[in-house]
A protein has these predicted regions:
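Periplasmic/ER-lumenal interhelical loops and adjacent helix-loop junctions
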Residues: 140-197
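Aromatic-residue-lined binding/catalytic grooves and analogous aromatic/hydrophobic interfacial grooves
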Residues: 119
Length: 197
């Protein structure tokens, strides 16, 4: 199912951007059968796989919203982004949010330069409502994640069952060095295209 979501979303996004049917199909086919996804399945990173498969739909919805600034675009964006957040892979969701921001900067700056204040207020209102709807759509997994966060290695304290209670380390979660290291080192990019490179 997730392969279909990613493939069809990529295909329609490419068609929306003006590519031919053949080019769109080849792009969607290449995106869907990327070798890295097999590694995600094998290593148990299914949440990351689902979040990546939602990426073309979210980007398509963001482009559509920023080009048209209407309710249909806001609804499409809210549904797609909310469903991506529901996949619970917050690293990919964060990268998607950065990508959405980079897509939306130019139209808003253009409107500011042209002093289209009414259009800016309308667009920001629709965008805020759609982000709130996205968060409401994904509230259940977000609340669960916030509930178990203090007991996660990314939260405040973890328990080591091999140590006595008085020997436990009290920490404030991940240190900055660990949290900001590469999840995929740049030299591993060749492995995405050619496995075991």
């Amino acid at each position: 199912l997730w392969y279909l979501v990613g493939g069809f979303s990529f295909f329609y996004f490419m068609r929306y951007k003006g590519l031919t049917i053949f080019s769109s199909f080849f792009g969607a086919f290449s995106f869907t059968l990327f070798p890295h996804y097999q590694a995600l399945w094998a290593e148990g990173h299914f949440t990351k796989f689902r979040a990546i498969m939602m990426l073309p739909l979210v980007i398509f919805a963001a482009h559509y919203f920023f080009n048209n600034r209407n309710i249909l675009g806001a609804v499409l964006f809210a549904l797609s982004f909310g469903n991506q957040i529901r996949t619970q892979h917050y690293q990919i969701v964060f990268y998607t949010a950065l990508l959405i921001f980079s897509i939306g900067v130019y139209p808003f700056l253009k409107d500011i330069i042209e002093k289209k204040w009414r259009k800016i207020i309308h667009s920001i209102s629709l965008l805020l409502v759609s982000i709130i709807c996205s968060l409401c759509l994904s509230a259940q997994p977000l609340f669960l994640a916030s509930e178990y966060l203090p007991f996660s290695s990314r939260g405040t304290n973890t328990v080591d069952l091999s140590k006595k209670n008085e020997d436990q380390n009290v920490s404030s979660g991940l240190d900055l060095q660990y949290a900001t290291q590469w999840s995929t080192h740049p030299s591993s990019i060749f492995d995405w295209l050619i496995p075991r490179f």
